[in-house]
């Protein structure tokens, strides 16, 4: 207990000059570290924000857009977005892996639309696979037509 009271009040052994000397380097170090941290944060285009997923390969914005189109009053929690994001990543990874196996089995080095369609059919059962294939084909046609229209302008 004696040490706590000695730490709380200034001791008689140290003078006010010694206290100032010991405090000055701390203040100098803190201002130097603040300047260094500001210099590190500022890049070429100023400070940048890092969102929850800095990698940029998240589907979170698309989930919210689709939900807004389908059910306007609803929202998604972060946990729900995280679960859905991992689900989509997993399915796309499985489709790519299966399409790669199909391309290797036909002795090709390029994954084409045919391998992708067959991978979707193999991975998704029954009607779900057929629906996914038709929706994927429609999406590809839609983007192709849009690209052609943009070239004509």
UniProtKB/Swiss-Prot annotation:
SUPFAM superfamilies: Histone-fold (SSF47113). Residues 37-52 have a biased composition (Basic residues). It comes from the Eukaryota. Residues 11-36 have a biased composition (Polar residues). Disulfide bonds: none annotated. Its main location: nucleus. Residues 1-54 are annotated as: Disordered. Testis-specific (at protein level). It is found in: Nucleus membrane; Chromosome; Chromosome, Telomere. GO terms for molecular function: DNA binding; protein heterodimerization activity; structural constituent of chromatin. One of its GO terms (cellular component) is nucleus. Keywords: Chromosome, DNA-binding, Membrane, Nucleosome core, Nucleus, Telomere. Pfam families: Histone (PF00125). In contrast to other H2B histones, it does not contain the conserved residue in C-terminus that is the target of monoubiquitination. Atypical histone H2B that can form nucleosomes structurally and dynamically indistinguishable from those containing conventional H2B. Nucleosomes wrap and compact DNA into chromatin, limiting DNA accessibility to the cellular machineries which require DNA as a template. Histones thereby play a central role in transcription regulation, DNA repair, DNA replication and chromosomal stability. DNA accessibility is regulated via a complex set of post-translational modifications of histones, also called histone code, and nucleosome remodeling. Can replace the conventional histone H2B in the nucleosome. The nucleosome is a histone octamer containing two molecules each of H2A, H2B, H3 and H4 assembled in one H3-H4 heterotetramer and two H2A-H2B heterodimers. The octamer wraps approximately 147 bp of DNA. Belongs to the histone H2B family. This is Histone H2B type W-T. It comes from Homo sapiens.
């Amino acid at each position: 207990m004696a040490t706590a009271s000695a730490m709380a009040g200034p001791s008689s052994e140290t003078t006010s000059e010694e206290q100032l000397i010991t405090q000055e380097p701390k203040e100098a170090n803190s201002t130097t570290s603040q300047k260094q941290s500001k210099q590190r944060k500022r890049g070429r285009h100023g400070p940048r924000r890092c969102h929850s997923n800095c990698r940029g390969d998240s589907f979170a914005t698309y989930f919210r857009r689709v939900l807004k189109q389908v059910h306007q009053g609803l929202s998604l929690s972060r946990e729900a977005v995280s679960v859905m994001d991992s689900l989509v990543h997993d399915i796309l990874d499985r489709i790519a892996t299966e399409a790669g196996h199909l391309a290797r089995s036909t002795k090709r080095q390029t994954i084409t639309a045919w391998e992708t369609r067959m991978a979707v059919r193999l991975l998704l059962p029954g009607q779900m696979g057929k629906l996914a294939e038709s929706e994927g084909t429609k999406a590809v046609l839609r983007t192709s037509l849009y690209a052609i229209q943009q070239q004509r302008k």
